[in-house]
Amino acid sequence: LQRTIGGARRPSLGEVRVVGQPLGRLDQRQIYAMRRRMSMLFQFGALFTDMSSFENVAFQMREHTKLEDSMIRDLVLMKLHAVGLRGAAHLMPSELSGGMARRVALARAIALDPELMMYDEPFAGLDPISLSVIGQPIRKLNDALGATSIIVTHDIQESLKIVDYIYFVADGRVIA
């Protein structure tokens, strides 16, 4: 599902619309443009191990905008503050706990204020304390950005605390 929404896989049947665009009719350039309007929080964060937390969050801004360094600095610190980690900007991924790494990855995912956020198992591998520490920022950031979020997870209990709607998918079909 997430691969189709992200444009990595074409729909085999029917029509899939993402941020108002019919995915099956888009060329590669249009798919890349559509992807700039969305972001993804990967299951285990996927932070660049040789970059600090600050540099991980700044990466997209440097790659996809022409913002000045001073503006990037302010925005990165704002994104880290939004996930409760402004003071961790200098830390390397190896110095972060699992919950902290997931929150840095969340700050990186929201760096460009996406319209659509996708989360791949955001609660996987987290201890009970870290579960709530990642769940609440997901909900707050979704509301603040006015974004649509899609959370793929097996952790129904945690999901119910932060979602507006829940769909159950089995064997490629929505069952509830």
What does each of the following model-derived ranges do?
Residues 6:
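Helix-to-loop junction immediately C-terminal to a conserved catalytic motif
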Residues 14-22:
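Conserved ABC transporter NBD signature motif
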Residues 21-22, 69-88:
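Conserved ABC ATPase "signature" region
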Residues 92-96, 100:
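Conserved ABC ATPase signature
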Residues 113:
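Conserved catalytic motifs of ABC-family nucleotide-binding domains
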Residues 117-120:
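Catalytic Walker B motif of ABC-type/P-loop ATPase nucleotide-binding domains
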